[in-house]
Curated annotation (Swiss-Prot):
SUPFAM superfamilies: Cystine-knot cytokines (SSF57501). The gene is FSHB. This is Follitropin subunit beta. It comes from Mastomys coucha (Southern multimammate mouse). Disulfide bonds join 22-70, 36-85, 39-123, 47-101, 51-103, 106-113. PROSITE patterns: GLYCO_HORMONE_BETA_1, GLYCO_HORMONE_BETA_2.
């Protein structure tokens, strides 16, 4: 009986790891430009899910401790024209679209690696309803 319970727990954990791994997901982000003074929401794809990681109890200075996160492996960029911007202003906005994901180190040059970032729906202006 105990072996059956242990096997069920093991299979459940395996399923949780395999079925909820790092993968593409649809998200809605708010985009804004200073010249336009409002936000619009657009749909794009980004990476989300779980990556195996561990934090050592005893830190070894000779061995760097890098936490792996679900992040993009490949990106493309799409450009849209924001409606309602002032004349003679640049109304084009380019945003990233993830096409492939993996578990890897967070690249702070291109990604918000903070624990509590502003989030994809943050907007400093009022939102324009289409």
């Amino acid at each position: 009986m105990m072996k059956s319970i242990q096997l069920c727990i093991l299979l459940w954990c395996w399923r949780a790891i395999c079925c909820h791994s790092c993968e593409l997901t649809n998200i809605t982000i708010s985009i804004e430009k200073e010249e336009c003074r409002f936000c619009i929401s657009i749909n794009t794809t980004w990476c989300a899910g779980y990556c195996y990681t561990r934090d050592l109890v005893y830190k070894d200075p000779a061995r760097p401790n890098t936490q792996k996160v679900c992040t993009f492996k490949e990106l493309v960029y799409e450009t849209i024209r924001l409606p309602g911007c002032a004349r003679h202003s640049d109304s084009l906005y380019t945003y990233p679209v993830a096409t492939e994901c993996h578990c890897g180190k967070c690249d702070s040059d291109s990604t918000d690696c903070t624990v509590r970032g502003l989030g994809p729906s943050y907007c400093s202006f009022s939102e324009m309803k289409e």
